[in-house]
Amino acid sequence: MPTATAVENLRREGITAGVHTVGDVMYDAAMLFAPVAATKPGPAAYGLQPGGYVLVTVHRAAATDTRDALEGLVAVLGAIDGPTVFPVHPRTRHKLEQAGLWEQVTQIANLHLAPPVGYLDFTALLTAARAVVTDSGGVQKEAYFHNVR
């Protein structure tokens, strides 16, 4: 189990055999690779300063498979105060193009659209962001690990 709380929850359910606290592999990986990610350009690649932008990721079906969801995404992107970096997942871009909304996204002021980035480059962007807007549980968790709201 990743935490003592998880072990305690199992104990209360009567499950104790073979249960051990081993930590969270995602946390361990995030901490292991953070120093390596710190060597990447991060926000400087977009002419931005650490803490001076919002990072956005969106790719899940619930956020991209209906026109209403896509229009909501466009509205959120337009409402973010200040610079925003949005590495666009191919699925998300395809859905925005299909809905005829991609051109509108490209016109949003202070929005830096980028192709998808690898883990280390993404971590460099994440750790230096002022805030994160995402539909990804993994990104939410990593933002928490790095004290990004």
What are these regions (language model features)?
Residues 16, 82, 148:
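A short helix->loop->beta-strand "cap" motif at the edges of active sites that frequently abuts
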Residues 1, 21, 87, 133-134:
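Short beta-strand scaffold positions
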Residues 38-128:
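Donor-nucleotide binding loops and adjacent catalytic segments primarily
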Residues 122-149:
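A donor-sugar binding/catalytic signature common to diverse glycosyltransferases
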